[in-house]
Amino acid sequence: IALCDHPEIEEILTRLVEMGYSISPASLRLDDITPTILRLLRQSGEKTITIAPETGSDRLRRVVNKTLTNDEILDAADMIFESGMENLKLYFMIGIPTETDDDLVAIRDLTLQLRERMMKYARTRGHIGRIIGSVNPLVPKPGTAYQWLAMEDDRSIERKIVRIRSLMAGIDNVYFNIKSERHSFYQALLSLGDRRVAPVIEAGHRNGGKWR
């Protein structure tokens, strides 16, 4: 359940702000963001909003059943930065079925457009924030459309990781954290494994959290 799903979320946030609480949501669904919610979060001291475009292209977003468009994402970014927010965190996925190099380039292009929105408002404040991206290989999860999908092979994911790092290199005020294919394999093991995985988890714990 997303934060903004609560029918009285604006009233709840208003009361929390009045009580002096700092409010820092993990992430916000773009289609639920309102100027009032952003204003209240900013009043509570929050400077960063996290959103999940998932992909850089509208086409690939539809593959994962997301109907949000890049234009809508950019409009939401205008609202976010206009509210006084300084930083924007982004969640992206790679390894989605039908993904091509054009889709990887689209991550860079969308990030650059979001950076332009940030810079427009930063100039009026005299302070430049940051765009912080997180890229994760697709991990099939139970109960989703891709729960039976095999993960993309390690070499293919590694090539895409190298490509993303190359595309994002040298962009001022933009920082990307890209999870390794090994880390994603561990996620898949924990998400999809049954009781037979228990001895592996126990062994990893005995080994100080190291899975090798």
PLM segments and residue spans:
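Conserved SAM/AdoMet-binding glycine-rich loop
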Residues: 1-89, 94-130
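Auxiliary Fe-S-binding modules of radical SAM enzymes
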Residues: 105-212
